[in-house]
Structure formats: C-alpha cells, structure tokens
A protein has these predicted regions:
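Secreted/periplasmic carbohydrate-active enzymes, especially glycoside hydrolases
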Residues: 1-343, 347-351, 396, 411-412, ...
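Substrate-binding/catalytic cleft of secreted carbohydrate-active enzymes
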Residues: 204-206, 318-320, 328-595, 604-605
C-alpha cells in the first residue's frame, strides 16, 4: 500500500500540477448523480472556486444552507512524459465525505472533512490528453462522525444540518488539489525525534519507503551540509545546532533520497526545526527552558470564502498574532490546512493540534444548554453509535498525527473538545485514544482534551488521562454574567482550588475564556456585550490566572469573530473575537497587547 500523507513537494524526481481554480458545480438533493452518469458529464453550467466553501458565495438561503450530496467537476492534462510514473491525485480536504471519479471510474472514497487523502490513478488516466475529474461530496452530520451532529428533514423535504457544535457547517473542497507524478519506488513517510547535547543536537529519524533500495538522509543549513546518515533508521549528529524557538524559528532543510547504484530513484525535501518540548515539574519546557503559553483558540473562518484556504488571510492572522504578543494557538476544533502549520514553523508559533472531536454532547436545546448543564442530556459514550464513532475517531487521530508529527510548531495533541465526560462510558472511550496518540507519536508530545464547564475536578472522568489539563471556562459570561462579576470571580476561584487538589504536578492551561462583544458597542457603566464589560471580565479572569502558580497558559476564545448556525444566542455568528471577522482590533486587543508583550517568556517559572 502506497498511502502517504507527506505534503506535496516538487523535486528532481517528483512533479506537481495544481488543480485549484474554477470548477463546475451542482447540488444533487435527490442523490441521483451516480446513476445518472454525472461522474462523466455534470449537467450544470454553474462554476465554483476551489478551494472555498460554497455556502457564502450564494445569495439565496436554500443554497447557503444546502445539506446533502453535491458535485464538483474539472479536467486535467497528463503530459506524455509522465508515462512510467505513478499518477496520484491529492486532496487537502473535502468536507465532510467524498467519492472521487476519474474518467467515470471511482478511484477513492474518504470520510472526514479536515485531513488529506489521495488516489492513485496510474491505470485510469489517458496520457497526453485531458482527463475528467469529478468529486461527489456530502456534508450531512451524524453522531458517528467528527464533528458530531444530526441531519433534519424540513417539511418541504430539504435536509438541514443540526450541529452539536458552535461553528458553521461550512462545506466544499476547502484545501488545494494536486496532480502528482511520483516514482514507482518512493519515500512514503518519515519521522524525527530530537535530543540536545553539550555539543549540539542529535536527530533520530525513521524513513518509510515502498521498496528495498538504500536510503540516505542529509541535513542542510542553507547550502552547507551539516549532517548525513544512511539507512531507513539512523541518527543525524548536528554540531553547534541552531535551535527552533518561539518567535526565533530556525529551520534546516532535510533531504531524503532513495538510490539505485549511482541513480537517485526518489528525492523528498522538507524543512524541520530542532527543538525539544516536555512537561517537567508542572512547567512546559521548550529546549529545556520554561515557556508560558499565550494566544488563541481560532477557526479557519473568513468572509465569503468560509473555511476555504486563503493565504492572504493566513498571512494577516500571523501578523496580528505577532503584533499582539501571542506565542501559541489551538487548532480549534479540527486540524487546519498544512500551509498554516508551515507558516507557524517559519514564524516560531506553538500549536496545540486538535482532532475534530467536537459536539460530543447532546441536549434538547443546543450546545449552550449542554454547556450550562440545562436540557435533557444522556451519556454520549453509552450509545449504539459509540463503537462506530470511536472507530472514526481513531482514524482521524491517526491521520492527524501522521500528517503533523514533523512540524516543530506542534507541541501537543488535543484529542477532544468539550466532551460530555461525567458518565460511566467516558473512561472506556478515552483510554484507547490516549494510548493510540502516545503510540503513534515518535516525539511523545503531551496529550490533553478541553474540559467542559460542567466537568468539575471531582466529576470529570477523563482528566486523569491528560498530561496537562485544559479548561474552557466562562465565569462572568455563561455563568454569573453581568452585575455579578464579583460572584463569578468567587465561584471561579472555588473551582480552581478544587483543581489544585487533583493536578498532581501537572500544569493547567485555559483553552477558552471570553465574552461576546459587538464591535463598537460602548456602555458606561458597562453591560454585557459592550467593550467595557469585555475588558472588565478579562481583567478579573487574568487576576485569577495570575494567582495560581499551576496555570501555565491562556488561550482566549476567540482570535476573531466567526460564523455559527443562526439562532437567538448568536448575532450573525460568535462575537467573542479579539479581532473582528475582517481582522481589525477590538478594544480588548490593546488590553492583550499590553499584557502579552510585557509578560516574560518564562512567566511563572519555578522559583528556586
């Protein structure tokens, strides 16, 4: 099996053609396209950009809210000189499931909307000709998928997504599509692990190929080769190594080659950063030095393009994070586009990488009622659907770690977001996931999950599996919001005293906290939704953080305003952003800039 999640790279042995652009598009509400032959000829003149969400490009509500099957179609040319190579199609993501056809022949199926997949089409394509590429996608939600939800049918027969999660169900081909020509024998994967020494660093590596020819691995600093080794496993010894660090990223070029005599059979290039990350004595240590995490929970979300990869927006986001003094973000609530991790590698940002395990709670109202403990709930992990959910969860976790394990920016894995984890089935569900993450990751990064408001120190059955505890807390907003801010602080401190008793030396971070603020809304005295109230809430919350030595990070919710399912609790989306959806600062941004640019990197380091 030649499955590989390596990022597409053009080298002396590999060729790439990008297929992004305007494709043809059609909804298929009756799911008749396959039988009607749409894989060979899509009966539509509608165009659609790739990558992008289709939702916000339309002006009618039925199209924006469409739920069900939908099709994309384009054509691609295969050069004659590619004959003799393996021809592979690679999709960065299709939300939430896809069937891929080439010249009418089905070549791939994939479940999961946030990770890449590929299809080998060597024996299907016609060389020196144009070939038809069709994608049948589907965006329905269920309790066996990540993220979780349901799909309802309206009175007129239309389907509508009913998510258990608080972000919009953007759908489409969201990330780049590549046509690749690869050598028959090639590099499929590699992994690295780092050790710092008195004279530099050592990099233990493992390379996976689909053949038996010898492998060499070289490390370059610019044009200078600084280390080399041979074999599919080995160690690169780097003297006077330049370490990758926060806002001081240093990247080396890794070159992996397969040889047959004097010929190079395959060559794969990547950029890596030498760094270590661990938890010791209740502190996060980057290259052996304490680092206090500060930054955001985020979303891949922007005007018009929805969740589609947009590099100008990515660039703006990183510039804003640098301006405000952040050093970390969580990929809430799903793995992001690979290009975002590459920029984090280059800019020196830390990432808590999150699998799309969100919506793992059920309420007769919505996510908010579940978060407050209102509405009728049941144990989410004691259902008939649980075995299928766990299988899909393991598959997504495996692909995320396989894809992202070599990024120096990735420092931890988040295995779930706000699951209902006080019921009897929690431990049976959690245990194999945490064991799998530890087994798959050669660097043994710390593992966590974000803890729901109703999961307290004495009721959460999942927290014992986490290497560090991650809390989502909204004292002063969802709990005791408004005039009772002093009471909210007292309740907050009471809960924190409880966590102090169960951490057993582990650090604790906040992966969510915040209030909604309508940009430009001012009120004296303050009221909820105003800029003044948002700042008062943040000052109170930060005072609590600073009081507890075991708090080792703060990731505010959210980086920017983002779209959600419409409802009476959301004014055209979630407004907890420190920046507007258009990436302009709210008043609170200046509060964070003052705090984060003055906090030392090793804030709360262990006092000797």
């Amino acid at each position: 099996m030649n499955r590989s999640l390596l990022y597409p790279r053009a080298t002396t042995t590999r060729r790439l053609i990008g297929l992004d652009g305007m494709w043809r598009f059609s909804f298929d509400p009756e799911s008749k396209g396959v039988e009607a032959g749409w894989a060979l000829d899509l009966p539509s003149s509608l165009s659609m950009p790739v990558p992008a969400s289709f939702c916000d490009l339309f002006t009618d509500k039925a199209s924006r809210e469409y739920c069900g099957d939908f099709w994309y179609e384009t054509s691609f040319f295969v050069p004659a000189e590619w004959s003799g190579w393996d021809i592979v199609l690679r999709f960065g993501s299709v939300t939430h499931r896809a069937r891929v056809f080439v010249n009418g022949v089905e070549v791939a199926q994939h479940e999961g909307g946030f990770l890449p997949f590929d299809a080998t089409v060597t024996n299907i394509v016609r060389y020196n000709q144009f070939n038809k590429l069709s994608v049948l996608a589907n965006n329905e939600l269920s309790e066996t998928m990540l993220p979780a939800g349901t799909t309802r049918t309206l009175a007129d027969g239309r389907k509508i997504a009913a998510p258990y999660f608080d972000f919009y169900n953007y759908s489409g081909i969201h990330r780049p599509v590549w046509l690749m020509a690869l050598p028959k024998e090639r590099v499929l994967d590699y992994s690295t692990r780092y050790r710092l020494t008195e004279t530099g660093a050592e990099i233990d590596y493992t390379v996976s190929t689909n053949g038996t020819h010898p492998v060499t691995v070289e490390l370059y600093d610019g044009t200078t080769r600084v280390a080399e080794s041979s074999g599919t496993t080995g160690t690169l010894v780097v003297k006077n190594a330049k370490l990758w660090n926060v806002h001081a990223a240093y990247l080396y070029d890794l070159v992996i080659r397969i040889h047959e005599g004097s010929a190079v059979v395959d060559e794969y290039l990547d950029r890596i950063g030498i760094r270590t990350f661990e938890i010791r004595h209740g502190r996060f240590l980057l290259n052996g030095s304490p680092v206090y995490l500060r930054g955001f929970g985020r979303h891949e979300d922007a005007d018009i393009r929805g969740r589609g990869l947009d590099l100008p927006t990515v660039k703006r986001d990183f510039e804003l994070m640098k301006w405000i003094g952040a050093n970390c973000f969580r990929t809430s609530h799903y793995p992001y586009a690979e290009e975002i991790y590459q920029m984090a590698d280059e800019e020196g940002f830390l990432i808590i990488d999150e699998v799309p395990a969100v919506g793992f709670m059920q309420s007769t109202a919505n996510f908010l009622a579940a978060n407050q403990g209102n509405g009728r709930q049941q144990g989410f992990f004691e259902k008939e659907t649980t075995p299928a959910l766990l299988k899909n969860h393991k598959a997504a976790l495996t692909d995320m770690i396989d894809r992202d394990k070599n990024h120096p920016s990735v420092i931890a894995w988040s295995l779930l977001n706000e699951p209902q984890c006080t019921s009897a089935g929690t431990e049976e569900y959690f245990k194999p996931l945490f064991e799998l993450a530890r087994r798959l990751d050669p660097q043994k990064r710390p593992r966590t999950y974000t803890v729901l408001m109703t999961s307290l120190p004495d009721t959460s059955k999942g927290q014992r599996f986490a290497d560090f505890v991650s809390l989502n807390r909204y004292y002063g907003w969802y709990v005791l919001g408004g005039a009772g801010l002093a009471d909210a602080e007292a309740s907050f401190r009471h809960e924190m005293d409880g966590w102090a008793k169960v951490l057993h030396g582990r650090p604790l971070i906040f992966t969510e906290y915040g209030t909604d603020n309508l940009s430009g809304a001012h009120k004296l005295p303050s009221v909820m939704w105003s800029a003044e109230y948002q700042n008062e809430y943040l000052e109170m919350t930060h005072a609590v953080f600073d009081h507890y030595d075991f708090v080792q990070g703060e990731l505010v919710w959210n980086f920017a305003d983002f779209q959600t399912t419409e409802g009476i609790l959301r004014v055209d989306g979630n407004k907890k952003g420190i920046f507007t959806r258009q990436r302009q600062p709210k008043d609170a941004a200046y509060l964070f800039r003052k705090r984060w640019t003055t906090l030392p990197v090793d804030f709360k380091k262990r006092k000797k």
